[in-house]
Regions:
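Hydrophobic alpha-helical
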Residues: 109-125, 129, 193, 210-277
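Beta-alpha junction/loop-to-helix N-cap segments that form part of ligand/metal-binding clefts
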Residues: 86-148, 239, 244-250
Length: 337
């Protein structure tokens, strides 16, 4: 994820590998580490109240995370308090204050505004906190979510492999749809794209690199028409985004001006909303799965452990799976394409 957000603070959430209807590409795993999913143990949360500051339930990734955490909290027998952060730091701050009033004993924080994290920590109850996908200093007891640098590098390398095999590493531009509001997650993930690509095709010349603070659907729709206008007649345009929505916007914008075949894209997330795109669009070079529908199988059991005073690893990173046209049906039930 995940990363999607407001102009000041947006998440991202998930990293891509190559998929093509014509060839098979050698890919590398998005993450060599990570923790296993753990389903909540019945009764383990009895008498405990846990909370979640959500990303934004209007976003598929955020809603999937919310639903999975609520599901596992119910299995554990814990009382669950949800407050939607709606991509805004001030809203997440109000959520933290609500948690204090409701005597939440531990919470998961998917606040999208990294700059607001200190204020949120201060306003909320002084209890164990697990950050989701975005650092929540200084009160996070653990960080759960993407292995951002490796996920980005995996995507970049896969795109590099594709361009090396098909175009001898020749390309017209490398457009990076980023999300500055999410802080270090953006730097790691988007920098990872560039590092991975450079490991195959060499460093990206400054003249070819075009970075935009446009990691969500609406922002990508805004910037891509102008970006394509600066590249008349070019048909080897690489576009990477901090999440799936950015690439959805990129393809929609390109299609509107008859240039959807001029861009070659990679995203992060492999959300359900893009499964058919990954499977059928040979210019969408793939995505690494973050499994937001299973985040609760990490967040809830480890948060309960923290509340009970048990030691928990600080890094609770997802074991990503590289999704492409040849394996998507093995990992997801893709229908209706």
């Amino acid at each position: 994820m995940k990363v999607v957000s407001s102009s000041k603070a947006r998440l991202g959430v998930v990293a891509a590998l190559a998929i093509s209807a014509l060839i098979t590409i050698q890919i590398v795993p998005a993450s060599a580490g990570g923790v296993d999913f753990r389903k909540a143990v019945a009764g383990s949360g009895k008498g405990i109240t846990i909370g979640l500051i959500g990303l934004d339930d209007s976003i598929g990734f955020g809603k999937d995370v919310h639903d999975s955490i609520e599901r596992e909290a119910k299995k554990a027998g814990a009382k669950f308090v949800f407050c939607d952060g709606k991509l805004k730091g001030d809203v997440a701050l109000a959520c933290a204050k609500t948690f204090k009033l409701k005597k939440v004993q531990g919470y998961l924080n998917f606040n999208a505004d990294a700059a607001a994290s200190a204020a949120i920590c201060k306003a909320g109850p002084q209890v164990p906190v697990i950050a989701i996908d975005i650092e929540q200093d200084p009160c996070q007891s653990a960080f759960m979510g993407a292995d951002n640098a490796n996920a980005g590098a995996s995507t970049g390398k896969a795109i590099g492999n594709y361009f090396k095999k098909n175009f001898n590493c020749e390309y017209d531009a490398f457009i990076s749809l980023e999300d500055y509001g999410v802080g270090i997650a953006n730097e790691l993930r988007m920098g990872g794209y560039r590092d991975g690509f450079a490991s195959v095709c060499g460093a990206i010349p400054a003249a070819k690199l075009k970075k935009y603070d446009a990691g969500r659907l609406d922002k990508a729709l805004e910037v891509m028409p102008d970006a394509l206008t600066t590249l008349p007649g070019k048909n080897k345009i690489i576009v990477v985004a901090i999440n799936d929505q950015g690439i959805q916007g990129a393809f929609s914008a390109a299609k509107a001006v008859g240039r959807e075949k001029d861009i070659w894209a990679g995203s992060q997330g492999a959300e359900k909303t893009v499964w058919c795109d990954i499977k059928t669009n040979d210019h969408w070079l793939g995505a690494t799965a973050y499994f937001p529908e299973r985040y609760g199988e990490i967040g809830v059991p480890y948060l309960i452990d923290l509340i009970k005073g048990k030691k928990v690893p600080f890094q609770l990173k997802i074991k990503h799976v590289a999704i492409n046209g040849t394996n998507i049906d093995k990992n997801f039930k893709v229908t209706g394409c």
